[in-house]
Amino acid sequence: METQYGLAKGGSCLVSNMATALDEDIKLNYTIDRLCDNFADLDDEYEKIIWRNYINEVKKHINTKEPIAIFDDSDINKEYSKKLEDLDRVRDASSPDKRIVNGYNVCEAVLLSKNTNQPISVYSKIYSCKSKNFKSKNTYTLDSIKAVENIVGKKFIGIFDRGYDDKKIFDYMDKKEHSFIVRLEDTRTLLFKGKKKSVEEVAKSRKGKIAMKVLFDDNEEYELMLSYTKATLPYNKKEYTLVIVYGLSEDKPMKLLTNIKIESKEDVIRIVRLYLSRWRIEEHFRGKKQEYDFENMRVRTLKSMNNLNMMLTIHLGHIAILADKIDSKLLIIKIIYASKSLRSKTIVWLSQIARGMKEILKYAHEGIKRWQDIEVRDPRQLSLKL
């Protein structure tokens, strides 16, 4: 409860900001030390209970008719840190030159909500390749897929970026009979009518014959041309569909591989729209990093980082649940109005709601002590009996 309030009012992953937001009648250092100890010493069983309660709430708000799960990796840039546990070397994807810096990897999976397709995180793990118990990045990817399976309890559509162009992902999704759409690397080779060719070569030799228009969140409209063809993975000889998208980038067309059955041009357009919904997880990451200063967290152990990340994930999940009710709850309109955002319309409301809550809570000067059920013990004074 303290962490959730601290995140909402402080708007930051810095423990000092959360402690300041609690506004307790003790020295700030004492509050900071207590919060840091809570992150470091959180019992594993208690952690599971907290996460299970969150997932039980999430299940009420996801799209159960056609569950759509989006998987992606991110990073935490700790360029100037030296003393953190198992500090790794990662590629800073947000930098213009994609430089290698000190930091950590983050594996994330979100499910889309049932009303307005808000991204609700159901798996988020910070890890280092230098940890003793590290096996492989695919281990975390498969764990994230299994987490989605446990929640939806049936088949779902998985959306994956280029980093997941891997036969282990194809094999697992096929084995479990899940649908998938994976963006392919340019170096991927497939069999076309029995001949091995790179997808880049095939994309250059074809022309888009199916037109579609896409309006992004920045109100910029793109006219795309699509093409598709049957293709086979050389190692398993299974047939899939390669969808090629022209017009998103001036450099190269986008190549998507899917096991979803395509029978008409409407099916092709649907595949592309499903994949383009992947940007919602990008908005989720952006909200984490910009609104809550995610990369600036200053706890030293991976256990503390993951516990703080879990609390932030739960916080963002409840914001997504709020946003999913935007058409039926006046409270959410009031929160967004309080954010004083320049844009009155958007698709993912995470940033506006986060800023709105922070703006409203800045008028609270008592913290949350009076709402907490704290046991007050009677002072036991020793007395001398004559």
Predicted regions and their residues:
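Active-site-proximal, Lys/Arg-enriched surface segment
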Residues: 4-5, 34-116, 227-231
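Short, basic interhelical loop/turn and adjoining N-cap
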Residues: 21-34
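Short alpha-helical "recognition helix" segments of helix-turn-helix
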Residues: 18
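Single, function-defining residue in the core of a domain
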Residues: 1-14, 50, 65, 82, ...
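Amphipathic repeat-derived elements
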Residues: 31-38, 144, 278
